[in-house]
């Protein structure tokens, strides 16, 4: 059984958006292949939420800026003794390639927005019980198509997000690897520190304590309060050790 639980908390709006997009894209593939109504609604609800997130900000612009920033950071390691130069060069080329694909791709999510079935389901998702067969006969007949036909369509939908997924995965991997975990100790369930212009907090907490962190703050300063899962009987120790990375 896993004994450590990893919590991540964004320290700015762009990271909040990126983590939400990453989560929703991961959810798209959880229940594949789509074989029933429940699986279909899970998939289409996540597609709809993804499109909502895309409409709230300049996702492509922010990602392109971050790809450039990561390239500049890596270039400072070129020629440094003891650093794997081939690895640095390979990462820089991967970042450049991801940026080229992203900048030449159509508007993010446009292929999904223009799909008739997705549009029909999105219109009904906010209505309680609004995806019944009599409300959405199109979805009903789609669910009775051969499995291979549905699978092919779903793969095409997901593939339309590949330029975004590739760039986002690279950016988040580099950010997560940018800082090591360090042991910290909270006093009476509280801990605060300077963020040092970090984008993301990563926190490892022992499952044995059955505590979770409530995190507030921004890139320059943050605070963590540890709360018991059992609000009536749970207790927070006077001193609590945990691991923290400011990425």
From Swiss-Prot:
Its main location: cytoplasm. It is found in: Cytoplasm. One of its GO terms (biological process) is division septum assembly. Keywords: Cell cycle, Cell division, Cytoplasm, Septation. SUPFAM superfamilies: YacF-like. GO terms for cellular component: cell division site; cytoplasm. Pfam families: ZapD. Transmembrane segments: none annotated. InterPro entries: ZapD (IPR009777), ZapD_C (IPR027462), ZapD_sf (IPR036268). Cell division factor that enhances FtsZ-ring assembly. Directly interacts with FtsZ and promotes bundling of FtsZ protofilaments, with a reduction in FtsZ GTPase activity. Belongs to the ZapD family. HAMAP family: ZapD. Interacts with FtsZ. This is Cell division protein ZapD. It comes from Shigella dysenteriae serotype 1 (strain Sd197). The gene is zapD.
């Amino acid at each position: 059984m896993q004994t450590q639980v990893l919590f991540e908390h964004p320290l700015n709006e762009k990271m909040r958006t990126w983590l939400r997009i990453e989560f929703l894209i991961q959810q798209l593939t959880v229940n594949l292949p789509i074989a029933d109504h429940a699986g279909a609604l899970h998939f289409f609800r996540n597609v709809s939420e993804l499109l909502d997130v895309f409409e709230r900000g300049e996702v492509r612009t922010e990602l392109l800026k971050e790809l450039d920033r990561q390239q500049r950071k890596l270039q400072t390691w070129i020629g440094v003794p003891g650093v794997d130069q081939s690895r640095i060069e390979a990462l820089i080329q991967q970042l450049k390639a991801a940026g080229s694909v992203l900048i030449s791709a159509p508007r993010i999510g446009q292929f999904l927005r223009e799909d008739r079935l997705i549009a029909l389901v999105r219109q009904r998702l906010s209505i309680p019980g609004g995806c019944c067969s009599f409300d959405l006969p199109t979805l009903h007949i789609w669910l009775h198509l051969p499995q291979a036909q549905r699978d092919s369509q779903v793969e095409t939908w997901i593939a339309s997000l590949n330029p975004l997924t590739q760039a986002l995965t690279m950016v988040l991997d580099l950010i997560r690897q940018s800082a090591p975990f360090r042991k910290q100790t909270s006093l009476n369930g509280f801990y605060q520190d300077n963020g040092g212009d970090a984008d993301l907090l990563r926190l490892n907490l022992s499952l044995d304590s059955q505590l979770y962190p409530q995190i507030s703050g921004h890139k320059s300063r943050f605070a963590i309060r540890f709360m018991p899962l059992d609000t009536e009987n749970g207790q927070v120790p006077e001193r609590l050790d945990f691991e923290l990375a400011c990425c």
